[in-house]
UniProtKB/Swiss-Prot annotation:
Organism of origin: Caldivirga maquilingensis (strain ATCC 700844 / DSM 13496 / JCM 10307 / IC-167)
Family (UniProt): Belongs to the aspartate/ornithine carbamoyltransferase superfamily. ATCase family.
Gene for this chain: pyrB
Record has Disulfide bond as a keyword: no
Protein name according to UniProt: Aspartate carbamoyltransferase catalytic subunit
One Pfam family matching this protein: OTCace_N
Amino acid sequence: MTWLNRDVISSLDFTRDDLMQLFYEAKEMENYAKSKLNILDGKIMATAFFEPSTRTRLSFETAMLRLGGRVLGFGSVEASSVAKGESLGDTIRMLDSYSDIIVIRHSLEGAAKYAADIATVPVINAGDGTQNHPTQAMLDAYTIWREYGRLDDLTIGILGDLRYARVVTSLVQLLSNFKVKLRLISPEILRPRRELVDFMRMRGMNYSLHSNLNEVLSELDVLYVVRIQRERFPDPVEYERVKGSFKVTPESLIGAKDTLIILHPLPRVDEVDHRLDSTRYARYFRQSALGVPLRMALLKLVLKGD
């Protein structure tokens, strides 16, 4: 399927071929991530961020500006007419009339699909509900591909909140297009939702569930860490106990492969020790930086085509 005028709502909407085309385009865009092109001159991107965002919003805006386009929109509900009671539908209709593409983040699951059903321009989901963040998953997979030159035949560990972190669902769905082994590590209370486990089983994915990083550390090529969210725990004492056991430190990586890379969608709190920032394992800052060329490629493909 062509990328031109395509909505980007869910990781499930994209094939392996789609993703590889995006990755090669993003690799080319790395050459221009600090310069300006005129590919999207005259195009306007509207950002509708009903939830706070730093990296996702700014990388989309930077990508559009680097491509020669312009940006309008808002970064919080308070900065929009939603604060006055305007409906999501009316907001989308207004942005649709002003722009060539809409990038939306919302707390409600299905908000991006709802926006796409209303809008006449393409809509990109920058995160909605607790289960969808397709462009973050694209960035994560792209970072792994840039590091290893492939996604097939890698063992990827995902550590932390596997139940509520929306990027986890999107990343697993996206990785189902490749021959990977998944090792999912979390406290019992934050195990993946049944729907995600059923999806992995249906797709015939090689996966296993674990409660301790040590069980799988030596086989990992990638360790993807997501924040454990305090607000999900009814008992603060239980949170403190669990949080401490899922912190990645130099000491906890004894026995890891020399080639292991650590990724994190950011922001981090204390789940990845800052002492790791200068080690050979750390790739999370490069991962964040690659968000600009990845989203440049995405915008170019959707607005200009192959």
